[in-house]
Amino acid sequence: MSVLDRLGPVPVGILWRLDNGELDGIIPKLIVLLAGTNNLNLKSKLDPTLKASTPDEIVEGLLAIIARLRKKIPTAKILTLGVFPRGPKPGGRFRIAAEKINSLLAEWLKGMERVEFADIGKVFLDGDGNFEEGVTRDHLHLCDEGFKRWRKALDPWLKNVR
């Protein structure tokens, strides 16, 4: 398993790692891509020029990652996950931005060979769109319960890989 997501400007960092040896020598059947939320609120003491990206810019970066993955590992299926809900309440700016990103991604990826889009964020929310108790400590980073739900939501794709 290789985790390509790190703090910072995610698409640029992932593209750099893909171009510099990440995933070399392995041929996964399935790649699960989740990226983009960090770009909604970039702040850095090391680089004050960093600014938040728009949903369109984030989608552009994600599409570049998908293109690079398809070229690097042409036989792999790429499951692109929608940006998870973020922020304490529905209707907040991060929730709206995530919904926009997910809508754009779903449209762009529709019909793309070996690429599937899945918006599984609702597994973390109650019927009113609020995070369920114990899923996250800060309305962004998942706790154990959140990771369990994420893993369970991936079961249909993981079972098809075996």
Residue locations for each model-derived region?
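Loop/turn elements at helix/coil->beta-strand transitions in domains of secreted/extracellular proteins
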Residues: M1, I27-I31, I73-I78, M112-E116
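Conserved beta-strand termini and adjacent loop/short-helix elements that scaffold enzyme active sites
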Residues: L4, L81, A118-I120
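Alpha/beta-hydrolase-fold catalytic nucleophile elbow
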Residues: L34, L79-G82
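Catalytic His-Asp segment of secreted/periplasmic serine-dependent ester chemistry enzymes
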Residues: P85-R162
